[in-house]
Regions:
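A short beta-strand segment in extracellular, disulfide-stabilized domains
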Residues: 48-50, 469-477, 542-547, 637-645, ...
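Residue-level detector of functionally pivotal "anchor" positions at catalytic/ligand-binding pockets or at interdomain
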Residues: 459-461, 522-532, 620-623, 697-718, ...
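C-terminal outer-membrane/trafficking sorting elements
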Residues: 21-26, 483, 558, 710-718, ...
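Acidic, histidine-bearing metal-coordination/catalytic regions of metal-dependent phosphoesterases
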Residues: 17, 27-142, 146, 153, ...
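Extended active-site neighborhood of metal-dependent phosphoesterases/phosphodiesterases
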Residues: 105-115, 119, 181-295, 314-322, ...
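Surface-exposed, flexible coil segments in extracellular/virion-facing regions
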Residues: 485-496, 570-577, 658-670
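Solvent-exposed loop segments of extracellular immunoglobulin-like
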Residues: 478-483, 555-559, 647-654
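Solvent-exposed segments in extracellular or luminal domains encompassing
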Residues: 492-505, 585-592, 662-680
Length: 791
């Protein structure tokens, strides 16, 4: 059990006076740290410090607020655990948020680790609003080849050269120590490799990869692998997030960021992977996202196996990657996850800001899946553009080349990638500063080969109403450069005391961002209806009508929404609704006539308001379409189809066998040239109100063509109409030897037979249904067609 001690105790005499036994050997032995110290679970008010010694000793941490200007006046604090062990885990609690601490570890008789590398900065509160620096990478701890070892070394060195002053979070993306995540591999390829200048002050939050589970044959089921012995992660909701009660997956909050760490390879209950909706992990993920919805501005999820990847692993062909994409991407879309970080593929890949893609790579559509058509780069180069006002969509980053670097021979990156690199390793450094995220992929040669920036909740227009002479502070909606329209530069706020109505704007130096502040100074209260100009509104559709007020508070009054007549006059307005907040949500009645000069007007329940109606807009009605005239037509080489449209043009329509077309006309005659019996059927009609109604008069039938009766005087057929049998008489001098064919009016053949006769031939037609048919007789010297009717 831990106990707090607030002064150092000298034990020299006590130790020397005791008999030397096994319990005291650790105190008298020349103890040495063989691993660490390293930081775990660094949060707002606490941290876990771990280390390993060569012999069992007690565990003592001495810590203090780092205040360079206090002359060392504060008293260090001590956390002591007298239990003798080689695996030391000490938790510090009650720390101040957003504060730098220094620490040493050892025993009451001997410090074992101290110096400039051993410090940490606690997490800020959600309102502290300082930049959070994050380092992410996967597939890094591998010294099995010279290429991997050199790559890992170069990536580390370039991180140290390019990192910010302090790295708050180090995200491990799985396959952290090759080949199998054993204790000696973690020791040699992570703890020894990265050393105290990183591990002594940078808290890591890991996920396992498949290689962590390769340590044992049963690890996926029983979880008895070294990885879980190395880590101390927040499983009980200690740092926010939903408790998972397992080290396999967990979540936590860090300032305004919600981070979820998942296990994409272990098995729940010995059979369910993360992608299986029956797994506890899948269900926990959904519940955690639901519980955190709206509480953090940013959501980041880490796990090993990527849903989109090419050229190292292939997410088209590997079943576990397909399953993850199909099962998890809809969840990420639903909860508007901002960033997914993966490893597994030994490359770097960064996708569009995208949503809705669960199929194979060839189904990715540039016009469908990206939610913003931008490359994410915040720079004045070519078509570069950052992601502005990100809402829906997720960026997927594969950061799996911090050690291993492999190419499967496929030259083509995944179609969703904005940038992809298989030729050089690197790691991802990114900073979240309030509503701005800036990421850099720093390659092993120090070149920043990819970067992207995401802004949320920027480019705002704010309307302010002031008393005359009142001072107001205007603050921009982003972090970065600022050029104010009143000449102030390089600060994110200004304070002004306007004496008249004015508009103040602020832009960034690159021209992507702009806030507008519309300031009204006194006098008369005004209510403005802010419906867009020249839009077309469909009846029976929900309409949002926003409004605002000047020179008063909106919530002080009740308001009613009125509609003008079709000429824009409010002589006899139609009352549409009442509310005390903006916007109005209404549905226009389908009894309203079409018109292009309607206006909305919002009125307050006081007679001294100036009322500014909306600009003119149009009211439109849904489309409907049907044929007029004959619905059955005899065959001709050119026929006319008559159409009648109702609703607001233009109309887009589709008729069987004819191309889709658009018209402004409400009455339309179409010239068609059939070549056989056909049914012209209206398939659909649309206008700006969407899919319209196809009326019951939706089809015109054209009868089968009749050939020229070149020899009709030489052959007769009777009776007509017929009952069960017809007689064919030959009035020529030659016998008729050929074929007899009967077709219905749609051109479908119902009978064909060979005939050979001199004077007459009887044909039995009792099997035919009642209707109209075309009979054709062909021989070497004769062709004859005639319409017959079967009763």
């Amino acid at each position: 059990m831990l106990k707090k001690v607030f002064k150092l105790t000298v034990l020299i005499y006590s130790i020397l006076s005791l008999p030397i036994g096994e319990d005291w050997m650790g105190l008298l032995h020349a103890q040495t740290i063989t691993r660490g110290p390293y930081l775990q679970q660094l949060g707002q008010n606490g941290v876990i410090i771990r280390w390993r010694t060569d012999v069992p000793t007690q565990s003592l941490v001495t810590f203090n607020i780092d205040s360079p200007n206090n002359g060392g006046a504060t008293t260090p604090k001590i956390e002591l655990d007298n239990l003798s062990t080689t695996e030391h885990i000490v938790q510090l609690k009650g720390l101040q948020a957003n504060t730098k601490y220094t620490y040493t570890v050892g025993t009451e008789t001997k410090p074992l680790a101290s110096g400039k590398d051993y410090y940490f900065i606690t997490a800020p509160s959600p309102t502290d609003n300082r930049p959070i620096n994050i380092w992410a990478m996967g597939d890094f701890g591998d010294n099995s080849t010279e290429v991997y070892e050199k790559n890992q070394t170069a990536v580390k060195e370039q991180y140290l050269k390019n990192k910010s002053n302090y790295t708050d979070l180090w995200l491990w993306l799985g396959d952290n120590a090759y080949c199998c995540g054993t204790d000696i591999e973690y020791q040699r390829q992570i703890f020894d490799f990265y050393g105290s200048n990183i591990l002594g002050n940078t808290a890591f939050f890991p996920v396992p990869g498949n290689h962590e589970y390769y340590e044992t044959a049963t690890g996926q089921v029983d979880k008895k692998i070294n990885y879980f012995k190395v880590i101390s992660v927040p499983t009980k909701g200690e740092m926010g997030g939903l408790p998972s009660n397992t080290k396999e997956y967990y979540s936590f909050n860090y300032e305004n960021i919600h981070i979820i760490a998942l296990d994409s390879y272990g098995l729940d209950e010995g059979k369910y992977r993360l992608s299986d909706p029956q797994s506890k992990q899948y269900q926990w993920l959904v519940n955690d996202l639901e519980a955190s919805k709206g509480k953090s501005l940013w959501t980041i999820i880490t796990f090993h196996h990527p849903p989109y990847t090419k050229r190292s692993h292939d997410s088209d062909g590997e079943a576990d990657l397909v399953a993850i994409r199909e099962a998890l991407v809809p969840i990420f879309d639903k909860y508007k996850v901002d960033l997914i970080l993966n490893g597994h593929s030994h490359s770097y890949e960064r996708s569009h800001l995208m949503k809705g893609h669960v199929g194979k790579s060839f189904t990715f559509n540039d016009y469908v899946h990206p939610t913003q058509w931008a490359n994410g780069k915040y720079e004045k180069k070519g078509d570069s553009r950052p992601y502005i006002n990100k809402d829906e969509g997720t960026i997927y980053c594969v950061v799996g080349s911090a050690g291993r670097l492999d190419w499967n021979g496929d030259p083509n990156p995944h179609p969703s990638s904005v940038y992809s690199n298989i030729s050089i390793g690197g790691s991802l450094l990114f900073t979240i500063n309030d509503n701005r995220l800036d990421a850099r992929w720093v390659a092993a040669d120090g070149v920043i080969r990819d970067n992207f920036t995401v802004f949320k909740n920027v480019n705002k227009t704010e309307k302010k109403t002031l008393e005359y002479g009142e001072k107001i502070r205007l603050t921009s909606s982003w972090k970065g450069s600022h050029l104010w329209s009143n000449g102030v530069n390089n600060q994110d706020f200004i304070e002004i005391s306007p004496r008249k109505d004015t508009i103040i704007s602020v832009v960034d130096s690159l021209g992507f961002l702009k806030d507008n502040f519309q300031i009204s100074v006194l006098p008369q209260p005004v209510v403005l209806t802010e419906f867009p100009e020249s839009v077309q509104v469909c009846v029976k559709n929900s309409v949002s009508v926003p409004f605002s007020v000047k020179n008063t508070q909106l919530d002080k009054w009740e308001y009613q929404l009125e509609l003008s007549d079709a000429n824009g006059s409010f002589t006899k307005p139609l009352l549409l609704g009442r509310t005390n907040k903006s916007p109005f949500q209404i549905i226009l009645s389908d009894a309203l006539p079409e018109g292009k000069n309607y206006r909305f007007r919002v009125r307050a329940n006081a007679d001294f308001f100036e009322e500014v109606p909306s600009k003119s807009f149009s009211i439109a009605t849904p489309a409907s379409l049907g044929f007029v005239g004959n619905k059955v037509m005899p065959f001709d080489t050119t026929l006319t189809l008559n159409l009648r449209f109702n609703g607001t043009p233009p109309f887009t329509y589709k008729i069987t066998s004819l191309p889709e077309a658009t018209t402004q006309a409400r009455e339309l005659s179409l010239k068609v040239k059939p070549t056989a019996a056909i049914n012209y059927t209206i398939e659909k009609v649309t206008n700006l109100c969407g899919v319209g109604t196809v009326l019951s008069e939706n089809s015109v039938s054209v009868l089968a063509p009749l050939s020229n009766e070149e020899s009709s005087e030489k052959i007769s057929i009777f009776p007509n109409p017929i009952s069960d049998e017809i007689t064919i008489e030959n009035h020529t001098a030659k016998p008729i030897i050929g074929t007899l064919t009967i077709k219905d009016v749609r051109g479908k053949q119902v009978l064909q037979k060979n005939v050979s006769f001199n004077q007459s031939e009887k044909v039995l037609l009792s099997d035919l249904h009642a209707g109209v048919y075309i009979i054709t007789i062909k021989s070497a010297s004769l062709r004859f067609s005639k319409k017959i009717i079967k009763n």
